[in-house]
Amino acid sequence: MQVILKEDVVNLGYKDDIVTVKDGYGRNFLIPQGKAVIASESAKKVLAENLRQRAHKIAQIKKEAEEKAASMQGISLTIKAKTSSTGTIFGSVTNIQIAEELAKKGVEVDRKIIVLKPAVKEVGNYTAVVRLHKEVTVEIPFEVVSENETIIEAKPEEAPVPVAEEPTAETEQAEVAAE
């Protein structure tokens, strides 16, 4: 089933895109939520006319996204999280926390356009991708640090080496009796 998106849908497409989705997803979610309409011939003609009229507006939106991306260049974030003694985070760092840290730096972005892959569950350096426009993305480096004072590096535990016992008179007698 082809639908025309009426708004941006994460991991599917942007407003006014014509996308192919499964029938159930279109009929039971996108259309009832008002996020899409069925892509009939008349709807496609209306969309084409609207796109022609809004071509200069789309260019303006892209320009604003590029300006915002330029203002975000060079920003790096530090996020504090509660951790175990080995550096594993209790919970995980989410796009909400990234959006809050960006707001503290003076950059307002919607949390829905921030993508974190892979899930951030340990102390370390990561990168978040902010999708400002379908053609404009920004990578924001961030570091996750512990709120705790010390972090012990996890080391593989060494198995104790068994110490060979010297044969005593009792063990020698037991071996002889066993034979």
From Swiss-Prot:
GO CC annotation terms, alphabetical: ribonucleoprotein complex; ribosome
GO terms of molecular function:
rRNA binding; structural constituent of ribosome
- The entry's keywords: Ribonucleoprotein, Ribosomal protein, RNA-binding, rRNA-binding
- Identify the InterPro entries for this entry: Ribosomal_bL9, Ribosomal_bL9/RNase_H1_N, Ribosomal_bL9_bac/chp, Ribosomal_bL9_C, Ribosomal_bL9_C_sf, Ribosomal_bL9_N, Ribosomal_bL9_N_sf
Q: Where is this region: Disordered?
A: 155-179
Q: Name one GO biological process term.
A: translation
Query: Which Pfam families did the record assign?
Result: Ribosomal_L9_C, Ribosomal_L9_N
Q: Does the keyword rRNA-binding apply?
A: yes
Q: Where is the composition biased (Acidic residues)?
A: 167-179
Give TM segment ranges.
none
NCBIfam families linked to this entry: L9
Family statement: Belongs to the bacterial ribosomal protein bL9 family.
PANTHER family listed in its UniProt record: 50S RIBOSOMAL PROTEIN L9
> What's the stated role of this polypeptide?
Binds to the 23S rRNA.
Q: What is this protein called?
A: Large ribosomal subunit protein bL9
Instruction: Please name the source species.
Output: Porphyromonas gingivalis (strain ATCC BAA-308 / W83)
Name the lineage. Answer: Bacteria, Pseudomonadati, Bacteroidota, Bacteroidia, Bacteroidales
User: Which gene codes for it?
Assistant: rplI
